[in-house]
Amino acid sequence: MRGRLSVVTVGCKANFADSAAILTHAARAGFEVVEGGAPADVLVINSCTVTRRADRDCRALARRLRREHPGAVLVMTGCFAETTPEARAKVPEVNHWLGIREPSSSLPRLLRSLAGDAASSGEELSDFAADRLLGHSRVFLKVQDGCDAACAYCVVPKARGAGRSLPRREVVE
């Protein structure tokens, strides 16, 4: 099905870096990347779950995109995608859920599947890889993701996992 792919990003700078990487993966898989929310065959919501309002906004965004693009494949990734099955069940509009901790292997595979490519290239791309500007004058360089702190009020470690960083050599390159 190759075609057009659009990413709508909700949340923090880490999500914007993740969205840039998603767009890089999509372009490499042969998709035409279009502006967030523009008509597309595949719509990706890079979601946030840091507050109850963010959860509500992501659910509303999924409903709106489904209403506006009834034939599109709707993919939800980001922190909201890491929430409980009960929370996911409240968003039946989503066709595919992609956890934030799995994009390096799952995203290329999902994109190839949506594009109709039966053969897997075995490609695994860095979760941190991005060469898209997302309308900015600078490329996002995410050198660390996740968090090792266990603050009682914060959902980031649960959603993004333990802290992990790019090797210093890769950051410099």
Residue ranges and their predicted role:
Residues 1-173:
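Proteins enriched for Cys/Gly/acidic motifs involved in redox and nucleic-acid/cofactor modification
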